């Protein structure tokens, strides 16, 4: 399971990518009820694509991947369309913004669209 906290922010070692998809899936199951409406196969395929997209863009921090996945899989949108919104992509890729700051930015972005991250 993924826990978003200031102490959890660090660049991942290459071995950590091996189970990243499983950890993010567990976190999304807890944070996003609509995520459970997808089949296990759909979730696996979609997460694989989003993680590959994040890696290609240079993401290296677990919480960045988790927040990026949450943003991409909100109900009512195609994740590729959301990803292509320039300000979303730029904000999530900033290397000098810590996860709590990204979480605050994302929380505001979600609130504008009527969503809220549980426990934040």
Where are these regions (language model features)?
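A contiguous, surface-oriented mixed alpha/beta subdomain in the mid-to-C-terminal portion of proteins
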Residues: 1-120
